[in-house]
Amino acid sequence: MTKNLYLGVMSGTSLDGVDLCVMDFAKNPPKLTACGFTPMPEDLRTDLSHLLKSGETSLQKLGEIDHRLGLLYAESIKRFLAEHQLSASDIQAIGCHGQTVWHSPNGNFPFTMQIGDMNLVAAHTGITTIADFRRKDMAVGGQGAPLVPAFHEGIFASPERLTVVLNIGGISNISVLAPQQPTIGYDVSVGNALMDSWIELHQAKRYDKNAEWAKTGTLIPALLDSLLDEPFFKLPAPKSTGRELFNLEWLVKKSANLTTYRPEDVQRTLAEFTVQSVVNELKTLESEKQCLLLACGGGARNPLLMQRFSELLPKWQVATTDEYGLDIDYVEAAAFAWLAYQRVHNLTNNLPSVTGAKEPVSLGVIYPK
């Protein structure tokens, strides 16, 4: 059978590295055939982290980071293809998200900024590259995020149940796939970002593997209540957020007593905050039908988070996308392969019911090989 391969490339707000996957669109539903990961070089991660936390840089520095990211994507793709015995001619197109450094969908001049020079990606790989997926949605009145729910709808929706796909990356976002209703999707809360930043600050680790540190801590109810008292949670959907809100500066503002707590107790509380802020939203969606929560993203590998979701959602079946045929670490990368496929065929790939856009459009800028 003829293959129809597209390569999805994603680097998220966690800054851990680059996810890559190949999707075969000759299959129905499309099939994930290969996946891989390239760690973010430490010097680039440091520069990006500073940029995300401060929001300040020089034009020269921004241009250099843009170039370095383009090279990272290109080299990651070439290495990935070689490892999987694939050539550039096997791939119809690359869908590359780029690296979000700012997302501000409200105000007088809404904008989103993803960097990483896609001219370099197309030139160095010899593969047509599709990128800049968010700004056209914003141009027609949308939030520019999230983009993945349309992909989730095609893969996971069922007329027999309410399905919510929860992606726990740096930020937690959901796709709500309800029978006979338009799909909706939006950011609901922080994901791993605060937990990752806190353990990096106190233990110089990138993340809390298997929640080992959080499990040694004790919940701080007063801090949890303060964190949950965040105006973002009261905003109507669709809505989007990022590290420009949920960061260590925000955490400090939320608690005058932060330095008096044991760091591991704060970590345990941040984990609980991640779960409870999501659960509060899910409980507003519960229906009489079967309810399925499908978790993906790095947070789906956190046993403490998954345990607490199961405990706090007794009416729901709680599972990961692994159990439904899509590796939890590569759902977003797979979605960008799908977005590229849709763009190449000039098909719409945003959902106005999700982003708030005035109309469905075909997102993505094409960078020819």
From Swiss-Prot:
CDD domains according to UniProt = ASKHA_NBD_ANMK
User: For this protein, what is the EC number?
Assistant: 2.7.1.170
Kindly list the GO molecular function terms attached to this UniProt entry. Answer: ATP binding; kinase activity; phosphotransferase activity, alcohol group as acceptor
Q: Which GO terms describe its biological process?
A: 1,6-anhydro-N-acetyl-beta-muramic acid catabolic process; amino sugar metabolic process; peptidoglycan turnover
What reaction gets catalysed by this protein?
A: 1,6-anhydro-N-acetyl-beta-muramate + ATP + H2O = N-acetyl-D-muramate 6-phosphate + ADP + H(+)
Q: What keywords are assigned to this protein?
A: ATP-binding, Carbohydrate metabolism, Kinase, Nucleotide-binding, Transferase
EC class of the enzyme, as a word: transferase
What Pfam family is a match, any one?
A: AnmK
Q: Where does ATP bind?
A: G12, T13, S14, L15, D16, G17, V18, D19
SUPFAM superfamilies from the UniProt entry: Actin-like ATPase domain
Question: Its annotated pathway?
Answer: Amino-sugar metabolism; 1,6-anhydro-N-acetylmuramate degradation; Cell wall biogenesis; peptidoglycan recycling
The similarity comment for this entry is: Belongs to the anhydro-N-acetylmuramic acid kinase family.
Matching HAMAP family? AnhMurNAc_kinase
What this protein is reported to do is described as: Catalyzes the specific phosphorylation of 1,6-anhydro-N-acetylmuramic acid (anhMurNAc) with the simultaneous cleavage of the 1,6-anhydro ring, generating MurNAc-6-P. Is required for the utilization of anhMurNAc either imported from the medium or derived from its own cell wall murein, and thus plays a role in cell wall recycling.
Q: Indicate what this protein is called per its UniProt record.
A: Anhydro-N-acetylmuramic acid kinase
Q: Which gene encodes it?
A: anmK
